A protein has these predicted regions:
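Intrinsically disordered, polar/acidic, low-complexity terminal segments
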Residues: 2-135, 164-168, 195, 205-215, ...
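Short catalytic/ligand-binding loop motif for oxyanion handling, primarily in non-cytosolic enzymes
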Residues: 34-36, 135-140, 185-190, 224-231, ...
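Transmembrane alpha-helices and membrane-interface helical segments
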Residues: 156-160, 189-197, 271-277, 318-334
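Membrane-interface alpha helices of multi-pass inner-membrane proteins
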Residues: 168-193
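C-terminal TM-helix exit segments that contain a strictly Trp-centered aromatic cap at the helix terminus
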Residues: 220-230, 301-302, 355-359
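Alpha-helical transmembrane segments and terminal signal-anchor/GPI-anchor hydrophobic tails
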Residues: 232, 246-325, 354
Length: 411
């Protein structure tokens, strides 16, 4: 009888997870079906990574750092995609691989255990925000997958010690290896993992591996930065842009408030200090998501183009701030005002995110030229050009290649 009850319980849990996954998939497709029906190549995916394959070859492009950091995920997805699917199918590869990263990040609360999402209601609420809280700019492109990787890494940090085996460990391992080797966003969390590791009284082999992996990833990214800084000019690290840093930091930290307008921003800036006056809220174990959010907001403002920050840089911080607010509802020594304010804020945040979720025309305009071989145009000196997204006025995102390249990668 006990075995039967356990089997029924497992079946119930599996059914619940199945419907959550199906719902997430449906909401994702409904955002803009054209992302899946007519995939596009986004900006640096074409200009940097596909051009790198054309210039350096499949293997050479795998080890090439770009734009100040090494990006394993972008490199191997583009290289493998070009090898087996060519120019005709590469957009499908980058789109679906990016979608896989989004799904594995958004659904991670179902696998990772943490006091910050220790109930079904918390898990579902968090999954919903992680899905609809990402701006359209970071949606379904490998270039911005680093921000999903960063949030996943933060969720691993906030979870209980890793004791998984089998597919769960493979899942975490796949995401973490890609995360620390794809941009600086995840490797930047290495100090937090080291701090947690040193404080832990029991250290498992998996925790040892994750800390070593993050340190290795940080070293790779620092080396890539130094190498590119010496060999080329990286304008994004121009210290003269420091005058933009305060505004960039502000844009990143209030990115969770999708609503425009200074009023809501001001309310959040005023309320969080009020929340922190409570001793239980102020405790490190409860305020940790907010601490990491502030750290990432500052770091990403410094590393962003012109230090202006922006919505794509705010996604990890927004997810962490949402977790901080969600956790306030579980604290017992918090007054009624804080609880009520938190409920209202969470509803405002979810409502605002839902409104913005379907605003995708700025990154996918149906009138823009599709990424198809029929839209290739000829240039002088036997060169060919294929435009990629975005096709905003006064921009020229395009892949330039030779007819020999077309013959080689035309599948």
């Amino acid at each position: 009888l006990r075995k039967l009850k356990l089997q029924l319980l497992k079946l119930k849990i599996s059914t619940k997870i199945f419907w959550i996954v199906v719902t997430v998939f449906i909401i994702s497709v409904c955002r803009e079906p054209l992302f899946f029906l007519h995939p596009r190549i986004w900006a640096e995916e074409g200009v940097i990574h596909i051009n790198s394959v054309l210039t350096n070859g499949l293997w050479g492009s795998l080890i090439s750092p770009h734009l100040g950091y090494y990006s394993l995920f972008n490199n191997y997805v583009t290289s493998i995609g070009m090898k087996f699917f060519g120019l005709l199918g590469i957009a499908y590869v980058t789109t679906w691989m990016s979608f896989l990263v989004i799904l594995l990040t958004v659904l991670s609360p179902l696998v990772l255990k943490s006091k910050f999402w220790d109930s079904d209601a918390k898990k579902i609420t968090l999954i919903l925000f992680l899905l609809i809280g990402g701006s359209a700019e970071i949606w379904l492109n490998t270039v911005n997958s680093q921000f999903y990787f960063c949030l996943f890494t933060a969720l691993v940090f906030l979870s209980e010690p890793i004791e998984f085996n089998g597919w769960k460990w493979i899942y975490i391992l796949f995401m973490m290896v890609n995360a620390v080797m794809t941009g600086i966003t995840s490797a930047a969390l290495a100090p937090f993992f080291i701090y947690k590791y040193l404080k832990s009284s029991t250290k498992s082999s998996k925790e040892n591996f994750l800390v070593a992996l993050l340190i290795f990833g940080a070293c790779v990214q620092i080396y890539s930065l130094i190498y590119l800084k010496i060999s080329s000019d990286i304008s994004r690290f121009d210290i003269s842009n420091i005058v933009n840093f305060p505004n960039g930091f502000y844009r990143n930290i209030v990115g969770i408030l999708i609503f425009p307008g200074w009023v809501i921003h001001a309310i959040l800036v005023l309320l969080i200090p009020i929340f922190l006056l409570n001793k239980e809220v102020r405790a490190v174990e409860n305020s940790l998501p907010l601490i990491i959010a502030i750290y990432l907001s500052a770091l990403f403002a410094f590393l962003s183009l012109g230090m202006h920050g922006g919505r794509r840089y705010s996604y990890p911080s927004s997810g962490l701030t949402f977790i901080f607010l969600l956790n306030l509802l579980s604290l017992k020594k918090v007054n009624t005002f804080t609880h009520l304010s938190t409920y209202i804020f969470l509803l405002i945040i979810l409502y605002g995110a839902a409104l913005r979720y379907f605003e995708t025309k700025d990154v996918y305009d149906p009138e823009w030229k599709k990424f198809t071989l029929s839209n290739i145009s000829e240039l002088p000196e036997n060169k060919l050009m294929l435009e990629v997204f975005p096709q905003w006025p006064n921009t020229n995102w395009a892949i330039i290649f030779s007819k020999e390249d077309l013959d080689k990668f035309k599948k």
